[in-house]
């Protein structure tokens, strides 16, 4: 029989065990920190009714969605966690307690053209806070503060969370008499870092129909730079000319104040008027996070405030604020840039227990003792030469090997070898547990990411 050649579809990430362990460490950090801020996990179906997922209309979403028929059912794979959240909240609005704080970490699917760093199946991590009728602006500062904490624990140092408010942009465009074109202008401005100011100017004038003067005025406005305090002070000069602008400026000032109170250093967040977010459902504060030494990567995390989350499924006003991290792409880019910590413990076990007798009873009892102490333990039960057993431990990167032979069993001891240092000692089981636990604690101190 002819054998099929195994292959993985283009645009789907499949990791070997060691990098998978690093990816799992990132997931652990996310879950731990999201829980620390009082978020509850939810898991929505990967497959939904196409009608539900496409409630906001077609466009680019419909082009990218994985859609199929099963009998009479028109189905689709979720393409993000936001639309399923809207359905979830509308469906369970009478059972949920508001403000509802949830996180979702899972795979989403988009039929994008496969290319370097772009995936058709990828992990996305979302956090959102949903209010009932109202939602305090304080939440709009707490969300990016969580991102700061998560990225810092990943090991990233040189990153910046850019913050803006769409009410400021809408208000400014209204001052220029461009309210009807504000959506098109924002989507164009959102491409600034990809295509540059000259091409943005061309699109504003030739495609959207702005005058050269208005296009230049917009580019001058979004180019305002300085410290956060300096940018806010320059924006004060526009106050009093548009109500939406004034509201947005008040909100942005409050968000920057609370970001500092949440412990986010000024070098890690900046008021940036170029941030617009292309999606129309954002109504207030918007964010994008970038790595300062790798601007070519683009945004590694983005989100913002929205006031009509479930408008297609419910008449209830459910404002919210949230952010999403494209984990698969972030991990791919970090790996490609050589920024994943090569010394991070990626072994599937802390201890490999090598029984040196035919009877495994003592080995099983010791393994149980080690596991009860929280140490991940494998028993090597294959009848192979000693060298092969040690090679197995070495290839997997297991840091400790415990030998248990007739002499050790008779004396109530075991031999513990640290494969990283080569040191070997004879200890009681309790002493072995303590030694290994301390060693593993030290090995686990490293971060997932090492910035160069």
What are these regions (language model features)?
Residues 161-171:
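Glycine-rich, mobile lid/loop segments that gate access to catalytic sites or pores
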Residues 42, 46-75:
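Polyanion/phosphate-binding surface patch
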Residues 1-20, 69, 179-182:
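Auxiliary tRNA-acceptor-end handling modules of aminoacyl-tRNA synthetases
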Residues 63-72, 178-200, 291-293:
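Acidic, His- and aromatic-enriched active-site or binding-groove loops in soluble protein domains
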Residues 19-37, 48-49, 72, 82-94, ...:
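Positively charged, Gly/Ser-enriched RNA/tRNA-binding surfaces
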């Amino acid at each position: 029989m002819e054998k099929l050649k195994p292959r993985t579809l283009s645009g789907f990430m499949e990791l070997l065990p060691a990098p998978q362990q690093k990816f799992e460490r990132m997931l652990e950090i996310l879950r731990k920190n999201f829980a620390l801020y009082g978020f509850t996990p939810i898991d929505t179906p990967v497959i939904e009714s196409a009608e539900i997922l496409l409630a906001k209309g077609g466009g680019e979403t419909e082009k990218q969605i994985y859609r199929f028929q099963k009998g009479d059912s028109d189905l689709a794979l979720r393409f993000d966690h936001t639309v399923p959240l809207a359905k979830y909240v509308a469906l369970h609005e009478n059972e949920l307690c508001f403000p509802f704080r949830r996180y979702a970490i899972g795979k989403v699917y988009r039929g994008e053209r496969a290319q370097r760093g772009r995936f058709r199946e990828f992990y996305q991590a979302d956090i959102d806070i949903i209010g009932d009728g109202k939602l305090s602006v304080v939440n709009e500062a707490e969300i990016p503060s969580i991102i700061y904490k998560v990225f810092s624990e990943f090991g990233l140092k040189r990153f910046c969370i850019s913050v803006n408010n769409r009410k400021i942009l809408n208000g400014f465009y209204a001052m220029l008499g461009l309210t009807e074109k504000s959506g098109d202008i924002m989507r164009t401005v959102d491409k600034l870092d990809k295509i540059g100011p000259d091409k943005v100017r061309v699109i504003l004038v030739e495609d959207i129909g702005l005058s050269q003067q208005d296009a230049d005025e917009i580019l001058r406005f979004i180019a305002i730079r300085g410290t956060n305090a300096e940018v806010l002070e320059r924006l004060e000069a526009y106050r009093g000319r548009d109500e939406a602008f004034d509201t947005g400026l008040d909100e942005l000032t409050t968000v920057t104040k609370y970001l500092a109170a949440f412990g986010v250093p000024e070098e890690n967040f900046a008021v940036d008027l170029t941030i617009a977010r292309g999606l129309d459902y954002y109504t207030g504060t918007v964010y994008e996070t970038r790595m300062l030494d790798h601007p070519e990567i683009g945004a590694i995390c983005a989100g913002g405030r929205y006031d009509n989350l479930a408008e297609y499924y419910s008449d209830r006003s459910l404002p919210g604020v949230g952010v999403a991290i494209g984990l698969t792409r972030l991990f791919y880019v970090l790996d490609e840039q050589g920024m994943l910590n090569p010394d991070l413990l990626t072994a599937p076990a802390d201890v490999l227990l090598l029984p040196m007798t035919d009877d495994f009873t003592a080995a099983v009892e010791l393994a149980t003792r080690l596991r009860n102490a929280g140490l991940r333990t494998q028993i090597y039960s294959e009848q192979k030469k000693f060298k092969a057993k040690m090679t197995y431990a070495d290839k997997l990167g297991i840091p400790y090997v415990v030998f248990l032979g007739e002499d050790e069993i008779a004396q109530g001891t075991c031999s513990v070898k640290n494969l990283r240092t080569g040191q070997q000692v004879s200890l009681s089981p309790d002493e072995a547990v303590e030694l290994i636990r301390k060693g593993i604690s030290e090995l686990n101190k490293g971060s997932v990411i090492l910035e160069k």
